[in-house]
């Protein structure tokens, strides 16, 4: 059995919507690649009030974060919550941080969202650091949350979005946060997870010897410079060199 570690509850037009989160690392490590199923979450008796608005939807996902030593140093951050926008709510702003950005190269951001409809594109927008983004034709700039999957190219997720965007030109070296703005004049959209993968270089001392002088065969004078290039943090005091 799986029990939620955190639950999220919100309302829209006098209807309640909920989400939940729990860590299933042990299960995934034990079973590895394969097919995972979720059962015993029957809400049939509760969905009647949601049918009229077309918001009688349920879904789930597993987010897997893994390490590959052959890749560049990346900082992975998972932000979970349950933020909702629709024609009856105000636009939302989400501040993601702390994040250490060394470069926008190969930096990405992903969204897990519910209830977005492909047929409703009324005043819908997604901005990252003030820039309106999309990935047409799969994710138009005025209908980003439309039941699509950036990884497979599928447009048949039916109210579930797994969308990934490149952050080239949207983040700068030294940035410590990313600002997300989402709005909609009609379509109900629920932002459940946001995942960032940014190019991040940890503090790492590198040494350049500039002059070596031998004195009386038992004394050596060294002149050297310590570098901390392309790092997003200062070298801690006492770092061995």
List the model feature ranges, each with a label.
Residues 199-225:
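Low-complexity, acidic Ser/Thr/Pro/Gly-rich terminal tails and inter-domain linkers that flank the onset
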Residues 1-53, 130-187:
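Cysteine-clustered segments with highest specificity for TGF-beta superfamily mature ligands
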Residues 91-157:
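Extended serine/threonine-enriched, polar tracts that run as long, contiguous segments within proteins
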Residues 33-35, 57-63, 73-75, 106, ...:
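Extracellular structured ligand-interaction cores
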Residues 70, 100-103, 117-120, 230-239:
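A short beta-turn/strand-edge loop motif at beta-sheet boundaries
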Residues 44-91:
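A short "linker-to-beta-strand initiation" element
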Residues 70-73, 100-109, 217-219:
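Extended extracellular/luminal ectodomain segments enriched in beta-structured repeat modules
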Residues 216-234, 239-241:
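Short beta-strand elements of extracellular/lumenal beta-sandwich folds
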């Amino acid at each position: 059995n799986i029990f939620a570690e955190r639950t999220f509850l919100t309302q829209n037009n006098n209807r309640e919507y909920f989400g939940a989160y729990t860590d299933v690392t042990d299960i995934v490590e034990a079973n590895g690649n394969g097919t995972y199923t979720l059962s015993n979450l029957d809400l049939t008796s509760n969905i009647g009030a949601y049918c009229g608005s077309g918001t009688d939807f349920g879904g789930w996902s597993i987010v897997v974060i893994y390490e590959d030593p052959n890749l560049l140093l990346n900082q992975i951050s998972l932000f979970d919550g349950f933020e909702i926008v629709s024609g009856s709510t105000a636009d939302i702003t989400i501040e993601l941080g702390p994040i250490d950005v060394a470069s926008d190269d190969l930096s990405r951001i992903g969204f897990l969202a519910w209830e977005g409809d492909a047929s409703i594109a009324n005043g819908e927008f997604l901005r990252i650091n003030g820039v309106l983004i999309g990935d047409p034709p799969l994710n138009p700039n005025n209908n980003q949350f439309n039941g699509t999957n950036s990884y497979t190219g599928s447009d048949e997720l039916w109210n579930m979005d797994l969308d990934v965007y490149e952050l080239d030109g949207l983040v700068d070296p030294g940035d410590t946060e990313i600002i997300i703005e989402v709005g909609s004049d009609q379509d109900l959209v629920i932002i459940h997870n946001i995942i960032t993968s940014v190019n991040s270089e940890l503090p790492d001392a590198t040494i350049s010897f500039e002059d070596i002088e031998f004195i009386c065969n038992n004394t050596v004078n060294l002149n050297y410079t310590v570098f901390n290039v392309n790092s997003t943090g200062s070298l801690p005091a006492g770092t061995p060199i």
